[in-house]
Amino acid sequence: MTNTEIFEKLTNAIVTQNIAGCVQLTQEALDAGIPPIDIITKGLSPGMKIIGDKFEAAEIFLPQIMMSAKAMSSAMEILTPELEKSKVEGEETGLAITFVAEGDIHDIGHRLVTTMLGANGFEILDLGVDVLNENVVEEAAKHKGQKVILVGSALMTTSMLGQKDLMDRLREEKLRDSLKCMFGGAPVSSKWIEEIGADATAENAAEAAKVALNIMK
């Protein structure tokens, strides 16, 4: 199989919730010498994007998302140790506080981004899913004075709206200027980021790591 064929099969395995197939193909891709980052960005992530789009359009429902997420997680169990091996050592990149917005429990994109940030030298503080804005502000306050980036994700438009409230709270608490804010997820656009006064968004996990490194310079 060519690399392109492997990527297409991986994408299809995610979309069809084929957990065993996803694991097998991920291992085959590694054995073929494909870099873990390419397996994620060209094979797995496109599958999750399709699933996210289908969910937004009400073509599929939560059980299918959970099964696709399980396929993705199973692949990441194989890939994370490989990503760790290529981790950037000795660079003081900063602290990434990662979380999924209140009312949202979709953590697959969040976990991917968290993994990629860690692999790129960030210290990670993962607050998990369905996180209240006040908890994010509290953690940001604890680390005032450090190099900090907040990285929040939301799969649903309803939970995305909470990002504006978070930005307002950070400004009220005089924390906004001391940190960077990046948000992602299917409904998040550059226009939205500009509207709420955040710093950046990214198309996928690998891009998120690059963007985060760039804005933390």
UniProtKB/Swiss-Prot annotation:
- Gene3D superfamilies assigned to the protein according to its UniProt record, in alphabetical order: Cobalamin-binding domain, Methionine synthase domain
Looking at the record's lineage, which domain of life comes first?
Archaea
Q: Which SMART domains match?
A: B12-binding_2
Q: Which GO terms describe its biological process?
A: methanogenesis
SUPFAM superfamilies the UniProt entry points to: Cobalamin (vitamin B12)-binding domain, Methionine synthase domain
Record's keyword annotation contains tRNA-binding: no
Gene Ontology molecular functions: cobalamin binding; cobalt ion binding; methyltransferase activity
Q: Where does this protein act, in terms of pathway? A: One-carbon metabolism; methanogenesis from methylamine
Which keywords, in A-to-Z order, does the entry hold? Answer: Cobalt, Metal-binding, Methanogenesis, Repeat
Question: What sections of the protein cross the membrane?
Answer: none
* Residue positions binding methylcob(III)alamin: H106
A Pfam short name: B12-binding
**InterPro entries documented for this protein:** Cbl-bd_cap, Cobalamin-bd, Cobalamin-bd_sf, Corrinoid_p, Met_Synthase/Corrinoid, Meth_synthase_dom
The chain positions of domain B12-binding read: 93-217
Positions of the B12-binding N-terminal domain: 1-91
Which NCBIfam families does UniProt cross-reference here? pyl_corrinoid
Q: Which family does it belong to?
A: Belongs to the methylamine corrinoid protein family.
What is its biological role? Acts as a methyl group carrier between MtmB and MtbA.
* Subunit and interaction comment: Can form a complex with MtmB.
Q: What is this protein called?
A: Monomethylamine corrinoid protein 2
Instruction: Name the species this protein comes from.
Output: Methanosarcina acetivorans (strain ATCC 35395 / DSM 2834 / JCM 12185 / C2A)
Q: Which gene encodes it?
A: mtmC2
